[in-house]
Amino acid sequence: MKLIGIGILVVIATGSYYAYQSLIPVNVDYPVILVPENILIKTGQSSDGHYLFNHQSSRGGKQVPRSGMTSPTLTISKGNLVSFHIINEIKNTPNQKSIHNFNIDEFNVHSKDLGYFESQSINFLADKSGEYAYHCTLHPEMKGLLIIN
């Protein structure tokens, strides 16, 4: 009976640790308890074959790829907790595997390399104003601008 109690305590402590860690955005070292602004970032391809990012925000609004379009400008307010949900929706071809990533260097936002239909969520705190580039390290044409005001 005592062993079961210790086991339950270990499970609770481990769960509490991971719950606490999930509250810490990638660019700060303390927990942030705010409702995040959710931004869905999807990889896409324009009609002329160029790779790009599309986005949809919990604030509404959607941008669809157009021929020759570069990636959208994202605007958020300083002090917001932002949750990026990144998904690679570009299918593999017989000659090439689809791999993409998403990065904002100034905020330590770096996704893993995502294969077809893989996804990842990353939280960061928009704690400084300015204009910051976001990009895919594998495809230089996949880039855009993040504005924090």
Regions found by a protein language model. Name each.
Residues 2-149:
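Extracytoplasmic copper-binding redox domains, predominantly the cupredoxin/blue-copper superfamily
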